[in-house]
Design a protein with these regions (language model features):
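SF2 helicase motor core recognition
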Residues: 102-111, 116-131, 151-158
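A short acidic (Asp/Glu
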Residues: 49-55, 80, 129-130, 146-147, ...
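Amphipathic, heptad-repeat alpha-helical coiled-coil/stalk segments that mediate oligomerization
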Residues: 84-95, 99, 110, 114, ...
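A conserved SF2-helicase RecA2
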Residues: 144-182
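Generic structural signal for small/hydrophobic residues in well-ordered secondary structure
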Residues: 20, 41, 128, 149-151
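A short beta-strand element within the Helicase C-terminal
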Residues: 117, 126-139, 163-167
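A short beta-strand-to-loop transition that corresponds to the Sensor-1 phosphate-sensing loop
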Residues: 43-46, 74, 118-122, 150, ...
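Conserved Helicase C-terminal RecA-like lobe
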Residues: 1-112
Length: 182
């Protein structure tokens, strides 16, 4: 019964996913810093991150030829780069090659990850300032976590003139739907 009820809910009807795809496409087509097409997408949930990777990676590869990666901390990383060993360090190095020293760590490598989808397993202690655009696909219950996420790209030593941070806020009608009192 439940399967039939959700059968019509497809990625094409997922307005939040469609908005994310639109934002990423706009960023790729109109970089805010010349030549920088990188986007970091955070989700609080590994299932959501997997869902996003499944749909975002396919769209970006087919539409722009861009590579996407996934890091959740509970599985080995994944990427659309054929034959790439998607360890945490390899993925982060190819997503932020200048700050992570790709030329030193992976001499001769041209592997380049344009979009990284991740959980909070990388929200602390990672320098990803090659990226200038970060999306919170869902908001963590702890506001400090949001600040930590932003801190991955808003760092001293960034070559970006400006950065952009985007939040997807929960639907406010949800409070009424579940009878939540102010």
């Amino acid at each position: 019964v439940l399967t039939k009820m959700v059968a019509d809910i497809t990625p094409a009807h997922d307005t939040k996913l469609q908005e994310l795809l639109r934002l990423i496409a706009d960023k790729i087509e109109h970089p805010i810093n010349e030549g920088n097409r990188r986007v970091l997408v955070f989700s609080a949930f590994s299932d959501t991150a997997e869902y996003l990777y499944e749909h975002v990676s396919t769209y970006l590869k087919e539409t722009y030829g861009c590579d996407t990666a996934l890091i959740t901390g509970s599985i080995d990383g994944r990427t659309t780069i054929a034959g790439f060993r998607a360890t945490l360090n390899n993925v982060l190095t190819c997503f932020s090659p200048l700050s992570k020293g790709r030329d030193v760590l992976m001499p001769g490598s041209t592997a380049d990850i344009t979009v990284l989808i991740a959980t909070d397993c990388i929200s602390e202690g990672q320098n990803l300032q090659d990226c200038d655009y970060m999306v919170n696909y869902d908001i963590h219950w702890n506001p400090v976590r949001i600040i930590q996420r932003f801190g991955r790209i808003d760092r001293i030593g960034s070559r970006n003139a400006c950065i952009q941070l985007v939040n997807f806020w929960p639907d406010l009608t949800l409070d009424d739907y579940i009878n939540l009192k102010p």
